[in-house]
Each structure stands twice: as structure tokens, then as C-alpha cells.
Amino acid sequence: DEVITSVTTLTAQKAHEKGLEFLAHVAPGIPEVLLGDPLRLGQILTNFVNNAVKFTERGEIRIEIEQVERTGEKVQLKFSVRDTGIGMTKERAAKLFQPFMQADMSTTRKHGGTGLGLTVCRRVVELMGGQIWLDSEPGMGTTFTFTVWLSVGQQQGSGRVIPDRLTTIRALIVDDNAAAREIIDDLLKGVVGQADAVASAAEAIAAVKQADANAPY
């Protein structure tokens, strides 16, 4: 959480200034206390998010973190930064992690360089026992993904406690962004009794009116 908070603090304002949606999702089930190198993780994520903002004119930037594997007191996490930006061809994407490589000169002139070298990011990820790759398509956006191994730390106290009364609540999620609805729905799983999602205020009003009197929102 500290890493995500730091990254969003540094980058969210830039996204909002361009009118972009900025979303971050940490999947349920990840241990609350992890030991690793938060500075390096933060630098890599910040670099990827800044690049995503730079090369995206409309749409959204989305950070996703999920657990891939757990072996004893070690967990492998997967970090993804997705954008709806200009994207690139497979040929250019394959060269992007080479030293001093940019997608092409026209892109560099319009949007600027990619900040902290992607070659450096790859080396840092490999030092942390992980891998790094990207998926991209021209005009459809880019997703940078990397994995790292972290140690599970000792949790202080009993962790998050969910009051029993919340498990009987029926929640209604209202957001015009499908990705945001998905993230909020995932966060509410195991917290409230039921969560439904709609895309507009009109749909929300209709859902509230149609709700059973014995199970209101």
C-alpha cells in the first residue's frame, strides 16, 4: 500500500490534468506485510505510469497488482500498468528494452522520451528475481508487466477486521467507467453481503426503486 500511495501521489495529478482516468487495483489475498525494496518498486512503477500518461491522450491509466505464486514465506507478485494510448508495433516493442532505443523519432518529438531507461528497469526487475515484458498494439494502448519475488513479513495485530453488520449490507456501485466498477466490486467482495453495479445516475435511481424493500441499498 505504501508503494502504491507513493506512486499515485507522484503521478495521478498529471493524469488528471490530461483528463485521464487513473485507477489502481490491488487484488485481494496479497499478504498485508511484504519485505523488499519499495524504492526500486516505486521507481519502476512511477516510470511506467509517467510514460503511460505521456503517450495517452484520452482514456485511462490502470495499475494492477496481483499474487501469482506463493512458496513458503515468499510470494511472487505481478505488476501491470495499462494505458489506452498510441501503442506501438510488435517490431518496435521488441526493441524497446534495448539501450537508448525509442519507439521512433516522430513519437519522441511529439511526446518526449521514456524517462528512466527501460533497460535499467529490466535490470532492476531481474535483480529482484523477476521478469519484465510488454504487450502493445498501435492505436490500442500498451501494457507493461513485471514480476518480482518478495518476502512475507510479520503482521502486527490481527489485521483488517470487518464488522459483522457490513456482511448484511447491499451496496450499489455507480460509475461510468467499467474498469472502475470492476475494481470497486472486487474490493467489496467479502466485505458486504452483495454488490451490484450500474453505469449512470439514472440506472442507479432505477435500481434503488426496484430494490426489494427487505433488501434495500
Model segments located where?
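Glycine-rich ATP-binding loops of the HATPase_c
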Residues: 129-135
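Glycine-rich G1-box
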Residues: 13, 86-87
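Short alpha-helical Gxxx[C/S/T] motif in the catalytic ATP-binding
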Residues: 112, 117, 121, 174
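Disordered, acidic interdomain junction associated with two-component signaling
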Residues: 6, 17, 25, 68-78, ...
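Glycine-rich GHKL/ HATPase_c ATP-binding element in histidine kinases
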Residues: 140-142
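Short conserved segment of the HATPase_c
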Residues: 88-102
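Short helix-loop "hinge" at the ATP-lid/N-box region of the Bergerat-fold HATPase_c
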Residues: 52-53
